[in-house]
A protein has these predicted regions:
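Short, surface-exposed interaction patches in beta-rich subdomains
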Residues: 18-29, 50-52, 56-95, 133, ...
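Post-signal-peptide N-terminal segment of Sec-exported extracytoplasmic proteins
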Residues: 27-53
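C-terminal motif of bacterial Sec signal peptides marking the signal peptidase cleavage site
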Residues: 4-7
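Surface-exposed, polar helix/loop patches in the mature regions of secreted/periplasmic/lumenal proteins
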Residues: 88-121
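A structural feature that tracks compact, well-ordered secondary-structure segments
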Residues: 37-39, 112-115, 122-123, 166, ...
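Bacterial signal peptide processing site
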Residues: 9-11
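Right-handed parallel beta-helix
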Residues: 112-141
Length: 225
């Protein structure tokens, strides 16, 4: 069960409903690896490392949308963390929904993110990430994996309408497949080889990162740095 800290802030939202804030912490409970599943209908999502246990989170949300639901279970040595908006949330004024999630940097993570609309910033280069699966309906998604990778990764990003920017570490061996529907694919620090983008790692490669990006309508930015 997640350890909860009660909401500490309530304000009026200028006629569109009460805005509340809540902070929560989740203990690792001895898990050796964790599957993290995030479901956000609309809003702004920020994810990064920095948690002492499994997760420290700060939520801002409209009261009428309901408090974000957090559930964590451990089976054997594998943990499963679910963070989601209640199913009855509304879509308008999604700027009132803001989640900041800080994750443990040392436990191996498989992360799945599903967003309906909004903006996501996933700064996960300092975590022990193995798999990342991102699906966004409409909006902007920024994924930053720069730093010193701790192992091989598989990354999948699927977008409907909007922009996706993916920053990748030049110390890793990169193998990227990107397909845009209606829009442009921009690549920096990468060489195009057939229908793929690759790099020449600086020094001995720390890891191999496989990336698959599929965009609907919008821009795809691939940056190796």
């Amino acid at each position: 069960m997640a350890l909860l800290t009660p909401a500490c802030y309530v304000s009026s939202d200028g006629g569109s409903g009460t805005v509340e804030q809540d902070s929560r912490s989740v203990d690792l409970k001895g898990a050796k690896s964790v599957q993290v599943q995030i479901e956000m209908g609309a809003g702004e999502l920020v994810m990064r490392g920095g948690a002492a246990q499994l997760m420290d989170a700060d939520f801002r949300y409209r009261a009428r949308d309901g408090k974000p639901e957090v559930q964590y279970d451990v089976t054997g040595s594998r943990g499963t963390l679910n963070v989601r908006q209640p199913s009855h949330h509304s879509i308008g004024n999604n700027d009132k929904n803001h989640w900041e999630l800080r994750l443990n940097e040392d436990v191996p993570l498989d992360i799945s993110v599903k967003m309906g609309a909004g903006e996501g910033r996933l700064e996960l280069g300092n975590t022990t990430l193995h798999n990342l699966d991102v699906e966004v309906g409409a909006g902007e998604m920024k994924v930053d994996l720069t730093g010193h990778p701790r192992g091989n990764m598989d990354v999948r990003v699927r977008g409907g309408v909007g922009e996706a920017t993916i920053r990748l570490p030049k110390r890793a061996r990169l193998d990227i497949e990107a397909h845009g529907g209606i829009g442009e694919i921009s690549a920096r620090g990468l060489d195009k080889r057939g229908d793929r983008w690759m790099n020449e790692p600086s020094g001995e490669a720390d890891a191999t990162i496989h990336v698959s990006v599929n965009g609907g309508i919008g821009q795809i930015n691939l940056i190796c740095e």
